[in-house]
């Protein structure tokens, strides 16, 4: 086993068995228990189409329910960098489009956005792009 953590307010334990292999052990209190999981992907945090309010509602509900959060990836678009041929000033949220430190701003803002939910995250995948 590589690592193991037990978030203080969750009914599960996440163990990292290998770099890309995790197990989640859920501690059921009875035979008729319910466990919640928020499965998400493609949040594209820096996209103007990313609904931060909806994401916050879902993440808040996950915390309230003690849910495991699994993010399959593509947390960022990151297509508005100086050297990216796909970049377009219309495809970037205004708070990230105003300065030369776009990548740092996106990563720091996303880290701040997700930090309150970190104890419930099982993993965050890389995504497909």
Task: Place the predicted regions along the sequence by residue.
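Short glycine- and acidic-rich boundary segments immediately preceding or forming the N-terminal edge
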Residues: 1-27
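Core catalytic region of metal-dependent phosphoesterases/phosphodiesterases
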Residues: 5, 31-34, 40, 45-129
């Amino acid at each position: 086993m590589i690592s193991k953590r037990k978030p203080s307010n969750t009914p599960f334990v996440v163990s990292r068995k290998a770099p890309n292999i995790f197990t989640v052990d859920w501690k059921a209190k009875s035979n008729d228990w319910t466990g919640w999981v928020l499965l998400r992907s493609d949040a594209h945090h820096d996209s103007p189409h990313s609904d931060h309010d909806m994401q916050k509602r879902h993440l808040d509900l996950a915390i309230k329910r003690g849910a495991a959060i699994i993010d399959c990836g593509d947390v960022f678009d990151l297509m508005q960098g100086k050297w990216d041929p796909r970049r377009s000033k219309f495809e970037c949220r205004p708070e990230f489009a105003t300065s030369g430190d776009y990548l740092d701003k996106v990563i720091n803002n996303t880290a701040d956005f997700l930090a309150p939910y970190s104890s419930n995250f099982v993993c965050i995948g890389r995504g497909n792009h």
